[in-house]
Amino acid sequence: MGLRSCTHLATLFMTLWALAFCFLVVVPIPAQTTSLQNAKDDRRLQELESKIGAESDQPNANLVGPSFSRFGDRRNQKTISFGRRVPLISRPMIPIELDLLMDNDDERTKAKRFDDYGHMRFGKRGGDDQFDDYGHMRFGR
């Protein structure tokens, strides 16, 4: 009888634990529901703005009223949490003044990478006696 009561308690505990887990997962938290409601409101405002924009292109649209002034103001519709998606001005990583002062070896390394025929060389370029013009290693010299 003792073993049966332990198994009954274990199954009861497991079912209660599963119900509690489902309750925590399924039932929404009030903070999440308010943020979801705010997101839905923002989306609804954007849809209304796009509809109003489409109607303003039509010549017979009557948009005089308080709804146009409320939805037409773009300052009220900006989301603060998101930053700029694209930078306004694309600038180089190194300022122009500093780039003129720096010694760039790009021209010298490009000359080393290609042979007289325009083919790219492979391998180390340490010494001319070690490799030929095509990047093949010389043996026996």
Curated annotation (Swiss-Prot):
<feature type="propeptide">
    <location>
        <begin position="34"/>
        <end position="73"/>
    </location>
</feature>
<dbReference type="GO" id="GO:0008343">
    <property type="term" value="P:adult feeding behavior"/>
</dbReference>
<dbReference type="GO" id="GO:0006940">
    <property type="term" value="P:regulation of smooth muscle contraction"/>
</dbReference>
<dbReference type="GO" id="GO:0002121">
    <property type="term" value="P:inter-male aggressive behavior"/>
</dbReference>
<feature type="modified residue" description="Sulfotyrosine">
    <location>
        <position position="134"/>
    </location>
</feature>
<keyword id="KW-0372">Hormone</keyword>
<keyword id="KW-0527">Neuropeptide</keyword>
<dbReference type="GO" id="GO:0007204">
    <property type="term" value="P:positive regulation of cytosolic calcium ion concentration"/>
</dbReference>
<feature type="modified residue" description="Phenylalanine amide">
    <location>
        <position position="82"/>
    </location>
</feature>
<keyword id="KW-0027">Amidation</keyword>
<feature type="modified residue" description="Sulfotyrosine">
    <location>
        <position position="117"/>
    </location>
</feature>
<dbReference type="GO" id="GO:0033555">
    <property type="term" value="P:multicellular organismal response to stress"/>
</dbReference>
<keyword id="KW-0964">Secreted</keyword>
<dbReference type="GO" id="GO:0005576">
    <property type="term" value="C:extracellular region"/>
</dbReference>
<dbReference type="InterPro" id="IPR013259">
    <property type="entry name" value="Sulfakinin"/>
</dbReference>
<dbReference type="InterPro" id="IPR013152">
    <property type="entry name" value="Gastrin/cholecystokinin_CS"/>
</dbReference>
<dbReference type="GO" id="GO:0007218">
    <property type="term" value="P:neuropeptide signaling pathway"/>
</dbReference>
<dbReference type="Pfam" id="PF08257">
    <property type="entry name" value="Sulfakinin"/>
</dbReference>
<dbReference type="GO" id="GO:0005184">
    <property type="term" value="F:neuropeptide hormone activity"/>
</dbReference>
<feature type="region of interest" description="Disordered">
    <location>
        <begin position="51"/>
        <end position="72"/>
    </location>
</feature>
<dbReference type="GO" id="GO:0006939">
    <property type="term" value="P:smooth muscle contraction"/>
</dbReference>
<keyword id="KW-0165">Cleavage on pair of basic residues</keyword>
<comment type="similarity">
    <text>Belongs to the gastrin/cholecystokinin family.</text>
</comment>
<feature type="modified residue" description="Phenylalanine amide">
    <location>
        <position position="139"/>
    </location>
</feature>
<keyword id="KW-0765">Sulfation</keyword>
<protein>
    <recommendedName>
        <fullName>Drosulfakinins</fullName>
    </recommendedName>
</protein>
<keyword id="KW-0732">Signal</keyword>
<dbReference type="GO" id="GO:0007528">
    <property type="term" value="P:neuromuscular junction development"/>
</dbReference>
<dbReference type="GO" id="GO:0071855">
    <property type="term" value="F:neuropeptide receptor binding"/>
</dbReference>
<feature type="propeptide">
    <location>
        <begin position="86"/>
        <end position="111"/>
    </location>
</feature>
<feature type="modified residue" description="Phenylalanine amide">
    <location>
        <position position="122"/>
    </location>
</feature>
<dbReference type="GO" id="GO:0008344">
    <property type="term" value="P:adult locomotory behavior"/>
</dbReference>
<comment type="function">
    <text>Drosulfakinin-0 (DSK 0) plays diverse biological roles including regulating gut muscle contraction in adults but not in larvae.</text>
</comment>
<dbReference type="GO" id="GO:0008345">
    <property type="term" value="P:larval locomotory behavior"/>
</dbReference>
<feature type="signal peptide">
    <location>
        <begin position="1"/>
        <end position="33"/>
    </location>
</feature>
